Amino acid sequence: MKVLALRHSVAQVYADTQIYLHDDSKDEYENAFLISNLTTHNILYLNYSLKTLKILNKSGIAAVEVQSPDELFALIRCNFTYDYENNIIYLHDYSYYTNNEIRTDQHWITKTDIIDYLLPGWKLTYVGYNGKNTRGHYNFSFSCQNAATDDDIIIEYIYSNELDFQNFLLRKIKERMTTSLPIARLSNRVFRDKLFPSIVNIYKKVINVGPRNESMFTFLNFPTIKQFSNGAYIVKHTIKLKQEKWLGKRVSQFDIGQYKNMLNVVTTIYYYYNLYHSKPIIYMLGSAPSHWIHDIKQYSDFTFETWDPLDTPYSTIHHKELFFYKDVNKLKDNSILYIDIRTDRKNMDWKEWRKVVEQQTVNNLNIAYKYLSTGKAKVCCVKLTAMDLELPITAKLLHHPTTEVRSEFYAILDVWDIITIKRFIPKGVFYAFINNITTENVFIQPPFKLKASPTDYIVALYALSNDFNSRQDVINLINKQKQSLITVRMNNTFKDEPKVNFKNIYDWTFLPTDFELKDSIITSYDGCLGMFGLSISLSSKPTGNNHLFIINGNDKYYKLDQYANHMGISRRSHQIRFSESATSYSGYIFRDLSNNNFNLIGTNVENSVSGHVYNALIYYRYNYAFDLKRWIYLHSIGKVAIEGGRYYEHAPIELIYACRSAREFAILQDDLTVLRYADEIEGYINKVYSITYADDPNYFIGIKFNSIPYEYDVKVPHLTLGVLFISDNMIHNVVTVLKKMKTELFKTEISTSYTYMLSDNIYVANASGVLSTYFKLYNMFYRNHITFGQSRMFIPHITLSFSTKQTVRIESTRLKINSIYLRKIKGETVFDMSE
């Protein structure tokens, strides 16, 4: 959903668009709630309130002021991520395909021959980091840039087994044009760029679990963040390999050598960060042309000092000369050294060339060892070739993708590697490594152990659900970690599958009820974005690869109506009820009937079930931005801080009724996941509320009327407003509550319109308009620890006779209350009050 705020209506009609006119009779929160439950994707919001826009954005729903037709057209035609704190819009708009254009935000790609392999007549455009070079295209009242690129296609091609780039590109563009936008992945970079600066500013020690290549630039500015990944491939792991020969396989049609070099250097930077927690100087030998340096500098400021007889245009200091062993003393501490020296073959015979390469490998290693043997805080990444060679058993081997699989690979060495044991590795083993292993991640740090860390802030985005982790250990970590942002795969299956397939692995699935948390928010990606100054125009698909975002230890937990709130809670219900349902009242009718309340007169205004809880359960796949458990818990302890909107405090029994309705809905839909979720939420309600039932009551509250429009043969026809189980010394407490509620009780507009047999030999009249007052009275008694109400549904009725009678129907008739009293069952009246 996107909300576009306009001062004036527009003549143009847009598909999937609805107009909402601000309702001045309601406050900003109520207007926001009504907007959030509209069913179209685009909402044109007229006569808007800035506060309402802010409320929507904090809820993760993109809401933007629009000042011109051009702005409206730009935003209505595509999806976007909105940085509402800084008023920046990041479009995810691929309409540039109509210019026969693909886009990249990586400069090095523009310096390759990729243009030769594009679709006929197409071009490649560099748009800068997150599309910032496109800002000049939009002369808008807000900052705007198009963050859409085709880097995902290019990178996927590089790691694929396909060689024909044009066919690959064509297929992927067609896929993009025929499938829903993966909005979470596209906006994730914007999210990370907001998330980590805010966390690092607050917490001294931050742990990040499971970063992948798409985050390789994000963390360059955060050397103190401790990364955990899948670990490095080290020399001693080669013992499992069988010897092979040179393969000579082409990986990419266009030259990706620069990409390989960039990955090598970035891998080395993060390896250095994990050891020394600071930024290094970057020395590079054999550096030309290294156009990728420009990409790194777009994200973070590094000093690059380079040596090469050819130009290296983006380095900080360039020495247009060769680097020799004797020059190692020029290199300072607190640095990394990237050795990529390789003489051009030219017309050299391959045997002679092989000797040169092997000698050069030895020379490279000698430079590396000398560099690491003195000084402090140093890491080296060195180019090697497949040959009989001794290497430290702890050296980290790299084989990032390059244009052709030949004889080349790389090793990362630190100051401890050069003093450890070395192992002789035959050439054939190195070929086996090169032929079969591709380094897929620039983060090669050790795996994370699933243990809470009291002093650290843990971020684990899309990293812990894999089934090689113990599911219970993941739950324990989340329950015990005081400060964290952790995601787990949401169970949105219909058969309550404990794990689901994802690519070539399996993920554990989770529901919010799997966790026992306090002061924590469990929400969706959208809900999480709102907490970090962002909103989004498109929610994740309800049956997609969705995750629960669990935020432990933040200052937003008690701001119930501001973050992870009830915005959009009824949206899916509205979509169903006003399109394919038997009636738009279907939800109300089902909730009453499933709790054996057969009086459906006015069911849409006097319902016996919490619609919030019911919708949050049966449509949780659509509205899990709403943190239901938090909502229940804060109500149970009486700490609901509400800024605005229509607030209705539910009685705990209403929540129980909602769970029972949801359970029956799940049975009818054969939805085993909702069935379990409803059961567990009911269990949670009973855990946080101290609900007691007067199933064996000894007192009741009765309402006597001035007159009854039916024949009756009981002595005094009355409405039982509820039963109690109390000791005699609690009568005073009950009377005190009744006196406090006196005005509201006598204002209750009770009406009747028919009679029926409640059960064998009990003839009653219906009573409408009672439930709201009943639940308020229930809450008053609950807060005063007085047992009121039974476990079964309260059905308001007036007993007329204890014999079988025919049903009578009349026009709805208002009943005037004569008195309200407290009476002992089969005993005397102990309190009576009149208006």
Curated annotation (Swiss-Prot):
Contains a bipartite N7-methyltransferase domain, a 2'-O-methyltransferase domain and a GTase/RTPase domain. The C-terminus contains a phosphodiesterase domain that degrades the 5'-triphosphorylated, 2'-5' linked adenylate oligomers produced by the host cell in response to IFN stimulation. Residues 556-692 are annotated as: GTase/RTPase activity. This is Protein VP3. Residues 171-245, 429-555 are annotated as: N7-methyltransferase activity. InterPro entries: VP3_Rotav (IPR011181). Residues 246-428 are annotated as: 2'-O-methyltransferase activity. Multifunctional enzyme involved in mRNA capping. Catalyzes the formation of the 5' cap structure on the viral plus-strand transcripts. Specifically binds to GTP and displays guanylyltransferase and methyltransferase activities. Has affinity for ssRNA but not for dsRNA. Capping activity is non-specific and caps RNAs that initiate with either a G or an A residue. Together with VP1 polymerase, forms a VP1-VP3 complex positioned near the channels situated at each of the five-fold vertices of the core. Counteracts the host innate immune response thanks to its phosphodiesterase that degrades the 5'-triphosphorylated, 2'-5' linked adenylate oligomers produced by the host cell IFN-inducible 2',5'-oligoadenylate synthetase (OAS). The host RNaseL is therefore not activated. GO terms for cellular component: viral nucleocapsid. One of its GO terms (biological process) is viral process. Its EC number is 3.1.4.-, 2.7.7.50, 2.1.1.56. Keywords: GTP-binding, Host-virus interaction, Hydrolase, Inhibition of host innate immune response by virus, Methyltransferase, mRNA capping, mRNA processing, Multifunctional enzyme, Nucleotide-binding, Nucleotidyltransferase, RNA-binding, S-adenosyl-L-methionine, Transferase, Viral immunoevasion, Virion. Residues 693-835 are annotated as: 2'-5'-phosphodiesterase activity. The active site is at H718, T720, H797, T799. Pfam families: Rotavirus_VP3 (PF06929). GO terms for molecular function: GTP binding; hydrolase activity; mRNA 5'-cap (guanine-N7-)-methyltransferase activity; mRNA guanylyltransferase activity; RNA binding. It is found in: Virion. It catalyses: a 5'-end diphospho-ribonucleoside in mRNA + GTP + H(+) = a 5'-end (5'-triphosphoguanosine)-ribonucleoside in mRNA + diphosphate; a 5'-end (5'-triphosphoguanosine)-ribonucleoside in mRNA + S-adenosyl-L-methionine = a 5'-end (N(7)-methyl 5'-triphosphoguanosine)-ribonucleoside in mRNA + S-adenosyl-L-homocysteine; 5'-triphosphoadenylyl-(2'->5')-adenylyl-(2'->5')-adenosine + 2 H2O = 2 AMP + ATP + 2 H(+). The keyword tRNA-binding does not apply. Interacts with VP1. Interacts with VP2. Belongs to the rotavirus VP3 family.
